[in-house]
């Protein structure tokens, strides 16, 4: 059976919500944003929640001060998507899962890293925890790293 693959934007019934865990790495944040922006979806039907978890959050810190969050937001807004940013203190995996529940996310988008051959067996601890503790689809993106 021949199947035709189309790159026409998929029309969604209502909003499609992504929760994106953004760490401190700019290239990974941009890779995550590019991956979402390049999906064949109607941009005006996509909502993206960018989440950065502060370790030991300091008083007065805001998520908008985090450069990877700003870069991802700019790229997604250029693509015409609705973007929100949230910051939380504490455990990143737990924050991602809680925000996904709060917003009834359709999909989670996390950053992956290149690893040694032994390290490739396991994802990073945050990514692994999220994958194991959610029933939502999880997309793991990686930046081109040298």
Annotated model-derived regions:
Residues 1-5, 107-146:
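Gly/Ser-rich helix-loop-strand patches that form or flank binding pockets
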Residues 46-48, 83-85, 138:
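Hydrophobic anchor at the start of a short beta-strand
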Residues 8-60:
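Small/aliphatic-rich secondary-structure junction motif
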């Amino acid at each position: 059976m021949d199947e035709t693959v189309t790159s026409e934007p998929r029309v969604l019934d209502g909003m499609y919500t992504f929760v994106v865990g953004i760490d401190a790495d700019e290239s990974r944040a941009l890779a995550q944003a590019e991956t979402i922006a390049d999906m064949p979806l109607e941009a005006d039907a996509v909502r993206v929640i960018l989440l950065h978890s502060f370790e030991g959050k300091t008083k007065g810190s805001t998520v908008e001060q985090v450069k990877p969050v700003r870069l991802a937001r700019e790229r997604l807004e250029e693509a015409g998507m609705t973007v929100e940013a949230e910051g939380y203190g504490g455990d990143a995996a737990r924050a991602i899962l809680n925000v996904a529940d709060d917003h009834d996310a359709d999909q989670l988008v996390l950053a992956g890293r290149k690893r040694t051959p032994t390290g490739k067996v396991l994802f990073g601890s945050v990514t692994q925890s999220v994958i194991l503790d959610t029933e939502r689809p999880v997309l793991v993106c990686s930046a081109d790293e040298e």
